[in-house]
Every structure is written in C-alpha cells, then in structure tokens.
Amino acid sequence: NAKNISVNCQINANNNGLHTIQKYKNPNLVLINESEMRNEMRDKDSPSRLLIKRLAKHLKARNVIVTQGNEGALFYNTKLKKFIKAPAFGSIIKDKVGSGDLFLSIFSIINSVTENAELALYTGSLCAAETLKEFGNSNILTKEQLEKLVIYNLK
C-alpha cells in the first residue's frame, strides 16, 4: 500500500468518453481539468466548487485540484473543507502538452514534503506555466531557475 496516491486522468482524442477517473478510489490527490471534471460528472452548468465537492465525495479523495486554463487552478481539501485558488501564470501559450503532468509532479512532491498545499499549488502552477512557453520539452527548468521564478513571483 502506497502512502500517497495521486491520480491524473486525462481525456484525449483516443479515449474521449471511454475512460473514467471513478475507478480510482481513496486517492490522496486527484488532478483534473475543468472540462474533464464536467465530462466525468455529466454536468456542464453547475458551479465548479460544487462539482469539485461532489467529485471528492464520490471518489473519497482527500484533495482535488481542478485546473481551469487562464483562470488558474482550484484546490480543495476535504478534511479542512477549504478551497485555495492559484492564478494562471501562463501568458505565452505555445504547447499545453505535459503541463498537467508537470503540475501534478511538482505539487505532489512539495505537498508531501512540506504539507503546505498553498505553496505546492503556487509552485506547480508556476512550473506548468513555464512549460507552455515552448514546444515539447526543449526548455527544461533547472532548480536555480525555479528558485528565481518563485522568489520573483512572491514579490
């Protein structure tokens, strides 16, 4: 049994409507984008926060993050019944592929080490925004670049 289970379940052209995040139960963290969540919940009109709570309850997830494109990301902790909003940092968007994967990786690592969801959400959003600027993985973010990025944006 793993201590922390994070799930990122994506819709793409090959599996639209054929996959579901609902087969994963009791995850520590679910990362899903707004349209994937609405598809999963079969609800295009309800407020995001209501759908996030419903999804968390159904999956018995401790934490849910919904990425919302240029609206940023919304984190929900079921134990604290608390939402945290992170802004969108990406102003230059060339390629979205991999940004959610990086977001999940950075968030999961920082949150498991620090238990500071706000810092993890913020840093994950910053890193994901950096991946949007280039096609593919031609621009790999170093530790030093990440530190400068976080410090600059905290000011």
Where on the chain are the PLM-derived regions?
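A short, structure-level motif marking secondary-structure boundaries and short turns
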Residues: 37-38, 113
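Conserved phosphate-binding/catalytic region of the ribokinase-like
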Residues: 1-6, 11-26, 45-155
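Short, histidine-centered active-site or binding-site loop motifs used for metal coordination
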Residues: 34-36, 89-90
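Short active-site loop/helix that positions an aromatic residue
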Residues: 40-42
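Non-cysteine beta-strand/loop elements that form the S-adenosyl-L-methionine
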Residues: 26-35
